[in-house]
């Protein structure tokens, strides 16, 4: 996946505004189950929010780890919520069009 440009990130952040977090990071932190949940959510939705219940001080680092493990990209971090994006591997099934 190509690196997102600033305007593309802004567009995706606006698309994510109305979304609710689909995955929450709890006391166990980043586990294989968490990575699997994020991966499945990205496959189904392409653009998701991940809420930090714990590890709030490490949210930037943890978001990067999750993005690397799921081959996605961190669109932004707002408060205790990270926005992740990964386009669908099949172009005809992509739900989100980015400029």
Report residues per predicted region:
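Positively charged, polar, low-complexity stretches
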Residues: 1-99
